[in-house]
Amino acid sequence: MSVAYLIKPKEKKYWELLCKPHLDGYIYPLKFTGKKMTIAQAKDQYENELHDLLVHDSIKYIICCDAEFYKALVAKAKPSVEIGTIKTTKDGAFKITYCPSPLSSFYNPDDFKHKFELVYTAVQKHIAGTYLDPGQGIITTGIYPKTLLEIKEALNSLHKHRKLTCDIETFSLKFYEAGLGSIAFAWNEHEGIAFKIDKSPTEQNTEVRKLLKEFIETYKGKLIFHNIAYDATVLIYQLWMKSLHDTKGQLDGLDYMLSNFEDTMIITYLATNSASGNELGLKAQSFEFAGNYAQENINDITKIPEDDLLKYNLTDVLSTWFVYNKHVGTMLKDNQGRVYGFFKKILSNIIQMQLNGIPIDMKQAKKVAKQLEQDEQDALKRIHSNKYVAEFTSKLRYKAMNKYNLTHKKQKTLLDFDNTFNPNSPLQKAELLYEDLKLPVVDTTDTHQPATGNETLQKLISRTNDQDIKNLLQAFIDYVDVVKINTTFMPNFLSCPYDEELKWHFLFGSLHLGGTVSGRLSSSSPNLQQLPSTGSKYANAIKSFIKAPPGWIYCGLDYASLEDHVSALLTKDPNKLAVYTDGYDGHCLRAYSYFKDKMPDITAQLDEIEKEGKIFKVTHDDGSVEFLNENNPKLKEILNESNKHT
């Protein structure tokens, strides 16, 4: 069979073991000069070495197991959603498809097996002349109502279906700017409807919105979403809420949207989660069904023709059905039903948190922003005024001058060059610190280069006695700290929307359930979990403008040592339970358990207590707790008093 496998040399034996028995062919190990091949390197290797060799060997099909190499050979390649899709190389010489590395079978064998089956089935079908691109022909019934009457009739016809998948397309990812571009419903993997709603981001179609709201309020079946935390947040705000903090509208919307729903993203998470992680996106989970149907301009739906947008929206809901059918059985088989039910309850809290947002005192935020900008400029000034940076800047200019003069007849002088040190460049920082200043390399990056992050710089401060170097390192640390806040967080704070009703600004973000292997919440736009916290130089500055509007109270709740409570209840360990039943300090108890030899005074005191007799825990009427020795007169007095009343 004229099939070529392009793989990394170290993967050859695994490919021969796992894959070659299913689909015979020839292995062509790729040449790697580093940890990862660049597209330019891949292109050069293909054009100067592989192409002629493949032609000579009469190869017709390529199975490429390296994403960068695949991108070099295929136009507009998206490897993760083109597994098992037969493409043509840019030069038209070969048919090609992408397959993940066989090494992935060691940490996620079922996933690799599934994807490899897609690959070899696609190649076999293409050779036999029966291949169809994924996604071709999946829409057997696509209804696209245009007029108000057609939309009303289409929505009425949906009431007969017990389950519907649903998806919306919006003008923005921010719910308060999103509008409602279009919506789609499907009753199986091949049949559904999709229709336009708002004409533009600023022009609402109130009549269609009214019909949609009435349908959701009266539909008795189950609505299935992929990531309902986004769709429901947008729909609740756009259909039920009259302002950013219309509490009645918010609660009404929550009741209707979450009365009977499923979320295929959570189902996928529970069915596929492993230590190696997983891809939860709808496109990634349905690529073998729908293919790569992503629209290039989906971030701005105004650039997509209406017919294309509606077909795209419909494909989303058909794919949601596919993902539901693909994973719901696995989730239930793995006894994850109760966990799923718990996650569904949590989604209600997440959606409400996303709609409520964080109150921001804009006047104070602007004041803090001004101070942060000043801190950034101060740090830059300290960096550029440092004598070692001045010397390095001169070196940069000399290098630029020499490079120019080597290739030009008309020579330039040093005054013609204004190169300056760039503190945002890891390469320049590494050259300055490790080559010029000869500091020791205490940490390296993933690519084995000397690290220049703040944790590394903090270590380096103690590795030199030169005060100018210490000052420079501290200036770097201060600069990075403040720049991160100024570029990542402050733009979000300063641009957050104003609520006319409460006369206050609010910051809104997205929370993701199932976005981590551990199950912890994750956050984006902005990442609220990375806000400067206790211990950070700017924690108090940020907290100073997170403030409730006049007449309101902003409060926070947190579990007290939640993990320790759970551990004590699950293990029934007497010492762990004693922390809560007898009022011990958990940290002290653990410290003594681990390091008894370091605490002879405590050991001696415990020995003396044991000699004196048993210890009793006494809880007084006011709730206070006291531990008394059996020979303590106070204990005897308490016992005598207690006996009088029994």
Name what the model sees in each region.
Residues 1-133:
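A polyanion-binding, active-site-adjacent surface
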Residues 225, 272-275, 557, 579-582:
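Conserved, non-catalytic sequence blocks in retroelement Pol enzymes and Pol-derived host proteins
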Residues 60-67, 165, 220-231, 554-556:
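Acidic beta-strand-to-loop metal/phosphate-binding motif
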Residues 586-641:
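Generic long, charged, amphipathic alpha-helical segments
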Residues 74-86, 90-106, 112, 186-190, ...:
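Metal-dependent phosphoesterase core characteristic of DEDDh/y 3'-5' exonuclease domains
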Residues 128-199, 247-254, 277, 288-289, ...:
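Conserved "right-hand" nucleotidyltransferase catalytic core of DNA-directed polymerases
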Residues 22-23, 180-184, 630-646:
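Short, intrinsically disordered, charge-balanced linker/junction segments flanking boundaries
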Residues 188-223:
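Nucleic-acid-processing active sites and adjacent nucleic-acid-binding tracks
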